[in-house]
Amino acid sequence: MTAAVFFGCAFIAFGPALALYVFTIATDPLRVIFLIAGAFFWLVSLLLSSVFWFLVRVITDNRDGPVQNYLLIFGVLLSVCIQELFRLAYYKLLKKASEGLKSINPEETAPSMRLLAYVSGLGFGIMSGVFSFVNTLSNSLGPGTVGIHGDSPQFFLNSAFMTLVVIMLHVFWGVVFFDGCEKNKWYTLLTVLLTHLVVSTQTFLSPYYEVNLVTAYIIMVLMGIWAFYVAGGSCRSLKLCLLCQDKDFLLYNQRSR
């Protein structure tokens, strides 16, 4: 039973991301490099957040009680802000690299920013999902019984679906965020930051899984629709894609912008 829970939750959480990687990234070495670079940027943001958290804990002398609750909230908010700052830094790096490539070899076609946004977002999402869910997933192999102290017996399942939504949100956030940077629409960046904060702070409502998941999935659907149109999608292109009649749909042959 524990093995079934482990593999079931693992495929729920990471199955869609794995499919995206296999079908849209794995065949192109350059995309793999950008994916790894995006994951690395997320790791550095986590490291910086951890350093701040450690320093604050030392300053407060590891006090218990309400102080720790406030520190936890502060830590989550700070971590989200740092992640978005590193997303911006990664965009700046990719933009400079793209411009440098064009200046060196004008005939070389650089990857479009839309494609880079998708790949970097998936890198952010996969690394975020791994760090947030792997420890929980390892506990599903046992020993122990979920819910023995009144916790929900659906804890692992809820965590898997929450990890899935966060991974997909990072993909959508990446596409929308990069588009906002390209068009200097700063309200777009603010929207990405605010929705990221909303999804992250929902973890403080952990006993109320229904509220968490419903809210997170509503945000995911809305961000997904936004990212779809930002990436150049339309109702017509979606119809052609679903009917397998569009071989040049969105990501495969994006022209450089």
Swiss-Prot record:
It is a multi-pass membrane protein. Keywords: Membrane, Notch signaling pathway, Transmembrane, Transmembrane helix. GO terms for biological process: amyloid precursor protein catabolic process; amyloid-beta formation; membrane protein ectodomain proteolysis; membrane protein intracellular domain proteolysis; Notch receptor processing; Notch signaling pathway; prepulse inhibition; protein processing. The chain crosses the membrane at residues 5-25, 32-52, 66-86, 115-135, 160-180, 186-206, 213-233. Pfam families: Aph-1. InterPro entries: Aph-1 (IPR009294). Its main location: membrane. Probable subunit of the gamma-secretase complex, an endoprotease complex that catalyzes the intramembrane cleavage of integral proteins such as Notch receptors and APP (amyloid-beta precursor protein). It probably represents a stabilizing cofactor for the presenilin homodimer that promotes the formation of a stable complex. Probably present in a minority of gamma-secretase complexes compared to APH1A. Probable component of the gamma-secretase complex, a complex composed of a presenilin homodimer (PSEN1 or PSEN2), nicastrin (NCSTN), APH1 (APH1A or APH1B) and PEN2. Such minimal complex is sufficient for secretase activity, although other components may exist. Interacts with PSEN1 and PSEN2. This is Gamma-secretase subunit APH-1B. The lineage of its organism: Eukaryota, Metazoa, Chordata, Craniata, Vertebrata.
